[in-house]
């Protein structure tokens, strides 16, 4: 499959110019490694089954040996050996050069064994990455510039129209922004990527993320409850009540533990409230808007199809908002922005700020 340009490409280039190392974080299958490989000069894949044990033995003995190679050197799934973090930081200090390493991984590392001694501040820049936006998947024309909307008061967007029909938007939301889905011919097969993603998260990754055994059935229930309440301000207690209908003994600490694991896997990424008054506590009193990192996760968790959503446009409205949030996170990142929502006590609201 031909590499499709990502907005993250330019962001990675700039960070490599400014820092000794860059850590790309984000959900699995969103294209982190492929994007990193476009700019790396050498690669080491820590999860290579033929070399993994040898790499781990080297990491335990002398981790700096794994860092030898042409730079920028990509260390894929570095969290397999957390000690590499300090090794990278130390090597960056010693070399005193920019653009030495790229680290990629699909989980937030929980350093229970104290293998990471330093934060990496000033040496290792963290760069979030998301599934593909509609512009990156070549489904949006990109005719409206987000940058110009901010920079040019005279910028006129009247008359700009999308050539995507409602049916195409629904399918794009169900398929998601997973690069692997674009390398598949049939639409039916494209939809399997997101479905398999949810299965892998629930059956394997939610326990593997920190070595704590968790129930796949409960993980599915929590993801389904999140999906039912996607892009709403529903309280955790309401979702827990929804879950206990089918699994009575689920407690709030257990619910929080599962959600935390899904957040560390970059599956759940709630949207925080925005408050225009910097010193005001209004934003703190506002709850988080429930959201997945990609709309296809919600669709797959609910077991819905494009046809189901065509017959239920109200539900699709929430799924569509999730897709808009994903795309705006991708676009606004390049401008140094972030995505929030606004909802005040007078019920004045803006879905996305």
Task: Write out the residue ranges for each language-model feature.
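Conserved catalytic/switch belt of AAA+ P-loop NTPases
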Residues: 85-109, 118
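N-terminal pre-Walker A segment at the start of P-loop NTPase domains
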Residues: 1-16
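Hydrophobic anchor at the beta1->P-loop junction of P-loop NTPases
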Residues: 24
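Structural recognition of the conserved hydrophobic beta-strand(s) that form the central parallel beta-sheet
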Residues: 74-75, 100-106, 128, 137
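Short glycine-rich substrate-engagement loop in P-loop NTPases that contacts/grips substrate
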Residues: 43-72
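Accessory nucleic acid-recognition modules appended to NTPase machines
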Residues: 182-353
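Conserved lysine of the Walker
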Residues: 32-33
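Interdomain motor-coupling "hinge/lid" segment immediately C-terminal to the ATP-binding subdomain
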Residues: 114-228, 232
